[in-house]
């Protein structure tokens, strides 16, 4: 297939029709809104479903295993984006890959909606991991195809798109969480499946008219010989996994440990390859060296942020006073706090950085602030933990904890991908999105091992130790920021 030039793509996309933006933004906004609705809705109740007793409609895992499974699931979702990016570049193009990913996700939620089967759960996890890996890294790329690089609407277009992500994430726990916890878990998972179906319908009905050629390019097509070899390799791996599970060689515990190792090993291999590559010159290797402490800092940040959906979700279920003046809260509703605070504070941060202009903090300093705020979000939880494990505490403690970590996220996350693309060697530019996603994959791989300590040690020690480590790491990064900035060789 011949490569399609950017000019042809732009000409094929109607440039007006959605608040002054290309009409294709409507398609991608609502597709991603419903995909995030399905994902965050499912995630809001999945942990509870895993550890709820079977007589009450759950799968009956112990809490430590349930938290580890959630962390490994999250890690694999981010690892799978490497495969999703590769398939888009070599086989399907980004738009087709997004659509196929949505289909996998929908069937994954349908499998979860099947009552009382651990087999259905494992099948659903495979489908959702594969589907999210296909969709997540590619839908943003299609948004980029709608604009020229010089288009002044480009940044605001991405802002509108990310608003769709956060609106989906905000509404999902409230709707899916209520259905799942108040009525039936499988009804909640079914609602998540319907959400993804609506996203697919919007995409299918409006794609041809709104997206034109956007996302249809396959920049580096796979040869027939390579495709056959890859297909055979995938089949062999799948058979090996099935045999390992059936024979008891691959247990849940071993699988969790294996993914934890991969979550750390894959980024290390990435960095070794880039540092030893002859395609990277001295300046690029200096910038890459500057990126290493930022990468480590991001892993620390996401390790705390992602525990909002695991450890803090358990805390909300067991330790928070959920009855307020006769009004009953659902513990899953706390998962709406993160996107709610992002929607509220993201415009304020955007205004602040614009107002400060050249006086705004450098990227290493922004990372430092984000990591310190994440640490403080756990330090705050030490105070309610002092009341003992039997005491029910005010929900405001969790609200404050989520607020602090979101403020940190708004310092670190928006500049994370940007600085990754700037500091990665040019020869590896295609892998920059995957590099940034690997910070989250590594964080959740670590969480799978660390989170098991929550029930084994005092809560004050758990929150206090992790919070203190994060604050110290943020402080070290702050002290090193002038050195890191020099090594960045002019990159802001």
Swiss-Prot record:
The keyword Transmembrane applies. Its main location: membrane. CDD domains: MFS_DtpA_like (cd17346). One of its GO terms (molecular function) is peptide transmembrane transporter activity. The chain crosses the membrane at residues 67-87, 88-108, 110-130, 157-177, 185-205, 232-252, 255-275, 294-314, 333-353, 367-387, 392-412, 434-454, 464-484. Signal peptide: none annotated. GO terms for biological process: oligopeptide transport; transmembrane transport. GO terms for cellular component: plasma membrane. This is Uncharacterized transporter YclF. It is a multi-pass membrane protein. The keyword Cell inner membrane does not apply. Keywords: Cell membrane, Membrane, Transmembrane, Transmembrane helix, Transport. Belongs to the major facilitator superfamily. Proton-dependent oligopeptide transporter (POT/PTR) (TC 2.A.17) family. SUPFAM superfamilies: MFS general substrate transporter (SSF103473). It is found in: Cell membrane. Pfam families: PTR2. NCBIfam families: yjdL_sub1_fam (TIGR00924). It comes from the Bacteria. PROSITE patterns: MFS, PTR2_1, PTR2_2.
């Amino acid at each position: 297939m011949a490569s399609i030039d950017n000019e042809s793509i732009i000409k094929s996309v109607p440039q007006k029709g959605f608040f002054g933006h290309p009409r294709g933004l409507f398609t991608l906004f609502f597709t991603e809104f419903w995909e995030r609705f399905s994902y965050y809705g499912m995630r809001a109740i999945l942990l509870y479903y895993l550890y709820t007793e079977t007589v009450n409609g759950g799968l009956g895992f112990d809490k430590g295993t349930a938290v580890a499974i959630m962390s490994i699931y999250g890690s694999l979702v981010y690892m799978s984006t490497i495969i999703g990016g590769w398939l888009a570049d070599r086989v399907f193009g980004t738009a087709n890959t997004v659509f196929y990913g949505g289909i996998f996700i929908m069937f994954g939620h349908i499998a979860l909606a099947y009552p009382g089967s651990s087999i259905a759960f494992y099948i659903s996890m495979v489908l959702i991991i594969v589907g999210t890996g296909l969709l997540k890294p590619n839908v943003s790329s299609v948004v980029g195809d709608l604009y020229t690089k010089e288009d002044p609407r480009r940044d605001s277009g991405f802002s509108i798109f990310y608003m769709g992500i956060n609106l989906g994430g905000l509404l999902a726990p409230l709707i899916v969480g209520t259905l799942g916890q108040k009525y039936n878990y499988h009804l909640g998972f079914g609602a998540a499946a319907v959400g993804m179906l609506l996203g697919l319908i919007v995409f299918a009905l409006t794609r041809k008219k709104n997206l034109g050629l956007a996302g249809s390019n396959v920049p580096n097509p796979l040869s027939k010989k390579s495709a056959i070899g890859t297909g055979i390799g995938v089949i062999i791996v799948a058979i090996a996994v099935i045999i390992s599970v059936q024979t008891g060689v691959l247990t849940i515990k071993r699988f969790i440990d294996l993914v934890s190792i991969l979550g750390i090993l894959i980024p290390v291999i990435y960095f070794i390859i880039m540092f030893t590559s002859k395609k990277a010159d001295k300046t690029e290797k200096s910038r890459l060296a500057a990126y290493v402490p930022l990468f480590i800092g991001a892993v620390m940040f996401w390790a705390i942020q992602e525990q909002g959906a695991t450890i803090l979700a358990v805390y909300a279920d067991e330790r928070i006073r959920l009855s307020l003046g006769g009004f009953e809260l659902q513990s899953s509703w706390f998962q709406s706090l993160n996107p709610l605070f992002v929607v509220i504070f993201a415009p304020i941060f955007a205004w602040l950085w614009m107002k400060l202009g050249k006086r705004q903090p450098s990227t290493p300093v922004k990372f430092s602030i984000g990591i310190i705020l994440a640490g403080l979000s756990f330090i705050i939880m030490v105070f309610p933990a002092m009341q003992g494990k039997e005491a029910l505490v005010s929900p405001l403690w969790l609200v404050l904890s989520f607020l602090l970590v979101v403020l940190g996220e708004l310092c670190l996350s928006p500049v994370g991908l940007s600085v990754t693309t700037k500091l990665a060697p040019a020869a590896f530019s295609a892998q920059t999105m995957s590099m940034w996603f690997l910070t989250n994959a590594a964080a959740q791989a670590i969480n799978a091992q660390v989170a098991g300590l929550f029930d084994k040690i005092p809560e004050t020690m758990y929150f206090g130790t992790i919070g203190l480590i994060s604050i110290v790491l943020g402080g070290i990064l702050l002290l090193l920021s002038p050195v890191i900035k020099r090594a960045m060789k002019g990159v802001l």
